[in-house]
């Protein structure tokens, strides 16, 4: 009888182990789905070169990235990505679709802050109301801090010099950490602004890409592609981890300030939209 009791006693524990194991296994697909949704929020900023499509879709020029911040189709990017359109021309964003090639949507320039190199776009028609594969990213309410783990997420065409819409963009994920803050001029004849340095370098086409905190998956900054280090000594002071020139990002607080001035709402991590009602 004692042997029978000994053999049956562990069953509740076994059931609990199985239950937790099943729950853990069931959580994995959700995590993967969340991870995939990050890329769905990012769009290449482009200029359409053709009036009608070819067998490969529309031919376009690629300038950088933008990302959605709410369900109304508003996006953030860095202002210098839009320099080509200062004297005219219509920017577009390349938006993913389910079971179809990406589609070009017009991107209206809503507001630009050249001093802090941030800008707001709005895609029309609103891709969140159609059959598009889109998502939005929350904006962090706390600034990035030194040593914080981050990831920069960007898209670029497979062929930069011969890009067409029927070719799905390639995804780049650059992981690293925040090194330090510096003050620099982001535009001629304007006051200095803050940027924070990244432990990884920035490559061509990453301008305007979101920099997300790994823990919250909220945007803490935008990749600043034209920033250059002025002193090799400063590199050594910033970190001994990376021998290459570090990348830089515009703090998200500058973009949030521009959104507030335009009364445009955004999302914070696991919260309803912030600020005033969306225009």
Annotate the PLM regions.
Residues 63, 70-116, 125, 236:
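Catalytic-histidine neighborhood of serine endopeptidases
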Residues 68, 201-223:
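Catalytic nucleophile loop of clan PA
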Residues 81, 132-194, 202-207, 224-234:
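Flexible, gly/ser-rich surface segments that form the specificity/activation loops bordering the active-site cleft
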Residues 2-13:
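Bacterial N-terminal signal peptides that target proteins for export
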Residues 30-31, 52-78, 103-105, 208, ...:
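A conserved glycine-rich beta-strand in the N-terminal activation segment of trypsin-fold
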Residues 25-61, 275-279:
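Protease-domain processing segments flanking chymotrypsin-fold serine proteases, especially trypsin-like
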Residues 12-22:
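Bacterial N-terminal signal peptides
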Residues 30-35, 90, 129-130, 156-160, ...:
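C-terminal cap/linker of serine protease catalytic domains
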């Amino acid at each position: 009888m004692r042997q029978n009791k000994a053999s049956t006693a562990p069953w509740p524990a076994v059931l609990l182990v199985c239950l937790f194991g099943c729950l853990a296994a069931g959580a994995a697909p959700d995590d993967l789905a969340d991870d995939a949704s990050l890329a769905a929020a990012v769009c290449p900023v482009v200029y359409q070169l053709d009036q009608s499509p070819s067998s490969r879709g529309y031919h376009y020029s690629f300038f950088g990235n933008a990302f959605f911040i709410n369900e109304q189709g508003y996006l953030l990017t860095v202002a210098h990505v839009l320099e080509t359109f200062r004297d005219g021309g219509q920017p577009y964003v390349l938006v993913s679709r389910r079971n179809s090639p990406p589609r070009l949507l017009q991107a209206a320039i809503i507001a630009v802050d050249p001093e802090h190199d941030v800008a707001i776009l709005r895609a029309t028609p609103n891709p969140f109301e159609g059959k598009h594969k889109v998502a939005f990213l929350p904006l962090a309410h706390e600034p990035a801090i030194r040593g914080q783990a981050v990831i920069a997420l960007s898209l670029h065409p497979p062929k930069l010099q011969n890009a067409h819409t029927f070719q799905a963009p390639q995804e780049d994920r650059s992981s690293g950490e925040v090194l330090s803050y510096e003050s620099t001029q982001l535009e001629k004849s304007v006051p200095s602004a803050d940027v924070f340095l990244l432990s990884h370098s920035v490559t061509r086409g990453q301008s305007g890409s979101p920099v997300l905190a790994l823990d919250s998956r909220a945007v803490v900054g935008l990749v600043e592609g034209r920033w250059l280090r002025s002193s090799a000594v400063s590199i050594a002071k910033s970190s001994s981890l990376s021998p290459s020139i570090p990348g830089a990002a515009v703090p998200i607080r500058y973009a949030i300030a521009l959104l507030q001035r335009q009364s445009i709402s955004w999302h914070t991590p696991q919260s309803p939209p912030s600020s005033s009602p969306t225009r």
